[in-house]
Amino acid sequence: MMLSAVLRRTTPAPRLFLGLIKSPSLQSRGGAYGRGVVTGDRGEPQRLRAAAWVRPGASSTFVPGRGAATWGRRGERTEIPYLTAASSERGPSPEETLPGQDSWNGVPNKTGLGMWALAMALVVQCYSKNPSNKDAALMEAARANNVQEVRRLLSEGADVNARHKLGWTALMVASISHNESVVQVLLAAGADPNLGDEFSSVYKTANEQGVHSLEVLVTREDDFNNRLNHRASFKGCTALHYAVLADDYSIVKELLDRGANPLQRNEMGHTPLDYAREGEVMKLLKTSETKYMEKQRKREAEERRRFPLEQRLKEHIIGQESAIATVGAAIRRKENGWYDEEHPLVFLFLGSSGIGKTELAKQTAKYMHKDAKKGFIRLDMSEFQERHEVAKFIGSPPGYIGHEEGGQLTKKLKQCPNAVVLFDEVDKAHPDVLTIMLQLFDEGRLTDGKGKTIDCKDAIFIMTSNVASDEIAQHALQLRQEALEMSRNRIAENLGDVQMSDKITISKNFKENVIRPILKAHFRRDEFLGRINEIVYFLPFCHSELIQLVNKELNFWAKRAKQRHNITLLWDREVADVLVDGYNVHYGARSIKHEVERRVVNQLAAAYEQDLLPGGCTLRITVEDSDKHLLKSPELPSPQAEKRPPTLRLEIIDKDSKTRKLDIQAPLHPEKVCYTI
């Protein structure tokens, strides 16, 4: 009785169920079920087809359509066939093969188990067809074009942007199903037209969720659409992508009018226009793309005026105002069209380690490409110190191992020609690599090992180097000391001069007479230095900036203590002054990080190990004079005039606001030594 009830629930499912039971064998993968997507070396879809389960007597001929895949510039569009299929109501015959299923021939014992496993998966799928909540019911109503039911469910609190368990939304279902009325209702209720589908392909989704591929296949066809290729990846596709695949002009226009982004790309990197057929839909998308780009430019220009780049960078980088101003000015020229379009922007960041060179490059890429991973390319030039390693840079020549793989730089620049490229520690690279960079910086193009030319005139190249870092640090410290003495002499006249020591500038005389000869001696060529637009100098941190670094590091550990151990961490103002003493001009912010770990985090770990920190407690870091709390060993003479640095101690704050010091035991040692906690 249950089986008959299940068979009445859907139309294609019972025939598929009976076909599985009757089938004596199933052929190997890829039989008559249709072709999958063939992906080219650029990731473009070569074919989108799906098999159709047609009703008895109906024609099974595929209805060819035409789509387009962009293989580079828009003017080089190549027409490719994609899918549409006749209606699907008949399951595969016993001779047909289900996609993605292996052959069962020759294994009689496992055949029965395999067929019954698939059959039971289908039974479970069919029996669970009935929506069990409002969100699932909304999906069903959206596909059935039941406008009244959609309105009722939305009024009762159904989430208009809720996702199916496999990743799509009700708006995507209505768009692929040609249900314009439902699309209008959903958009009016606040549906987001720019949400991307989380469903990839049948087999990948089945593997990710740990279910059988047949269950995913039937669910996709019953709950979404039965005319899409099961092997194609739809991850990241928006409702506009699906409306274009359905070639529905009215729904495409409705989505665009409601704010759908025609430039949004799916996981494969394709916009809706890449799937459009020749006709009204393609014309509408081209017009919308042009208008959207113009609005986007105006919106970004207004945003830049209200929130300048320098201000954004200062939120993530402490100090280095001169470096931020130099980079911000160059980026502003580029964004507003006041730059040489035939040459890329090239920077050389000079300074000691750990003062923000790499972080500034990362934040620049984040600003330019909105967190896109492809927009930031980082190459550690210490990996290219030998001559034979140059091949890894642009790819091996024909006949050599790795020729088909391409180079580390050229391969990534193909994917994003306007990326921000960081050459970290460029002073360690082999001279032959610098020769390649000459062409890259001068002409904005690069030829890979396959002989193909990559045009990257719109890219931004940033090199970092520790060359002349000692000279820059010593000169900056000298300038800061002179400015500090000057401000002390003028403190009675103008209190604003106290901060003069924090703002210093490297003189032109120092750059020309000290730095440039060092760079020329190292890189050994003027033409290489002449192709650099800006040489940016990173200076050592001043005292106020070091205090910010300490507080930033303490805030990091306070957040970690709260998340992992439910412990609230506080500290006195004097703690930052004590930790600043651990700063080393040669190691930059890393020395502060290590000092906090040695003097604070070590105590936290020891106290936690000794069960001195109850859950939900509040800790405070305080400063004590170490001379009063020195643990003396009888074998060692007591210190007389020796001055010890202040000691940081942990105190626990009770519920009645009383504090008590934690007695953290020093680790035992075979020899009797003196410990200072």
From Swiss-Prot:
Span list, region Regulatory: 477-505
Region named Autoinhibitory: 92-126
EC id: 3.6.1.-
Sequence segments annotated as region (Disordered): 85-104
Free-text description of this protein's post-translational modifications in UniProt: Proteolytically cleaved by protease PARL. ATP-dependent protein disaggregase activity is stimulated by PARL-mediated cleavage of the N-terminal autoinhibitory peptide.
Keywords: Acetylation, ANK repeat, ATP-binding, Hydrolase, Mitochondrion, Nucleotide-binding, Repeat, Transit peptide
Regulation: Disaggregase activity is inhibited by ADP.
PROSITE patterns: ANK_REP_REGION, ANK_REPEAT
Chief localisation class: mitochondrion
Binding residue positions for ATP: 316, 318, 353-358, 425, 466, 531, 590
Reaction equations catalysed: ATP + H2O = ADP + phosphate + H(+)
Subcellular location: Mitochondrion intermembrane space
GO biological process, one term: granulocyte differentiation
Residues the record marks as site: Cleavage: 126-127
MF annotations from Gene Ontology: ATP binding; ATP hydrolysis activity; ATP-dependent protein disaggregase activity
Spans of repeat ANK: 133-162, 166-195, 235-265, 268-297
Subunit composition and interactions: Homododecamer when substrate-bound; the homododecamer consists of 2 homohexamers stacked head-to-head via ANK repeat-mediated interactions. The active substrate-bound form is likely to exist in a dynamic equilibrium between homohexamers and homododecamers. Homotetradecamer in the unbound state which is remodeled upon substrate binding into the homododecamer. Interacts with PHB and PHB2. Interacts with MAVS; the interaction is enhanced by Sendai virus infection.
Record's comment describing the protein's domains: The ankyrin-repeat region is necessary for ATP-dependent protein disaggregase activity. It plays an important role in stabilizing the substrate-bound homododecamer by mediating contacts between the two homohexamers.
The name this protein goes by in its record: Mitochondrial disaggregase
Source organism of the structure: Mus musculus
Gene: Clpb
